[in-house]
């Protein structure tokens, strides 16, 4: 897939604000500061399309980006950020759940985890939740530029075993800094995204 144009559409906090044009959507989810916004900027070739911050929890709404005037990338609020109130965490969780459960346009979910660390309890819960609802899942281990060469195999094993990744799901390393994994991810995202709609 070649991304020729990308456009920020809306930051939504409730379903009434979601786009209503029924285009295919692919969501990006992960812990706060997992690198979702940076990843979106890299694969769209736009340095500032998605707002990035060194402060975890910057994304507090559901951000929709129209890609090639054909489908949406959806940047979801990060989870597991300890420095916000319980009520804020619950509000973010409810917002994400409301979107993920009821959005029939949603075809794929990209789950981002930090390649340097064992997935957290929240990462495991998120993966299990995604699989419970039957979504096609791509696990992207970010910040791979921080790994030593001999860390890749070991960390891949730890991540896949901790999450108990299903055989049908894809796993890959990615770096927003050196852009490794960019083409592979774009190829995976493009696989069959319009086939179901064509059949209907």
Curated annotation (Swiss-Prot):
Mg(2+) binds at residues 37, 59. Coiled coil: none annotated. The keyword Nucleotidyltransferase does not apply. PROSITE patterns: G_ENGB. Keywords: Cell cycle, Cell division, GTP-binding, Magnesium, Metal-binding, Nucleotide-binding, Septation. Transmembrane segments: none annotated. CDD domains: YihA_EngB. GTP binds at residues 30-37, 57-61, 75-78, 142-145, 174-176. One of its GO terms (molecular function) is GTP binding. Its cofactor is Mg(2+). GO terms for biological process: division septum assembly. InterPro entries: G_ENGB_dom, GTP-bd, GTP-bd_ribosome_bio_YsxC, P-loop_NTPase. GO terms for cellular component: cytosol. Pfam families: MMR_HSR1. It comes from the Bacteria. Residues 22-195 form the EngB-type G domain. The keyword Protein transport does not apply. Belongs to the TRAFAC class TrmE-Era-EngA-EngB-Septin-like GTPase superfamily. EngB GTPase family. PANTHER family: ENGB-TYPE G DOMAIN-CONTAINING PROTEIN, MSS1/TRME-RELATED GTP-BINDING PROTEIN. Necessary for normal cell division and for the maintenance of normal septation. NCBIfam families: GTPase_YsxC. This is Probable GTP-binding protein EngB. It comes from Clostridium novyi (strain NT). The gene is engB.
């Amino acid at each position: 897939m070649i991304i020729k144009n990308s456009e920020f559409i809306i930051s939504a906090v409730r379903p009434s604000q979601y786009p209503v044009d029924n285009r295919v959507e692919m969501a990006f989810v992960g812990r706060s500061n997992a690198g979702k916004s940076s990843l979106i900027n890299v694969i769209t070739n736009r340095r500032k399309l998605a707002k990035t911050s060194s402060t975890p929890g910057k994304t507090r709404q559901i951000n929709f980006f129209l890609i090639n005037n054909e489908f949406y990338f959806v940047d979801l609020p990060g989870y597991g950020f300890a420095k916000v109130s319980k009520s804020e965490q619950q509000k973010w969780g409810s917002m994400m759940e409301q979107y993920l459960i009821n959005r029939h346009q949603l075809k794929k979910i990209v789950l981002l985890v930090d390649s340097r660390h064992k997935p957290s309890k929240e990462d495991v819960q998120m993966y299990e939740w995604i699989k419970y609802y039957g979504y096609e899942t791509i696990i992207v281990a970010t910040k791979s530029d921080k790994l030593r060469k001999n860390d890749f195999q070991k960390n891949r094993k730890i991540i896949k075993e901790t999450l108990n990744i299903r055989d049908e799901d894809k796993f890959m390393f990615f770096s927003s800094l050196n852009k490794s994994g960019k083409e592979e991810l774009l190829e995976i995202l493009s696989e069959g995204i319009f086939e179901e709609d064509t059949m209907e």
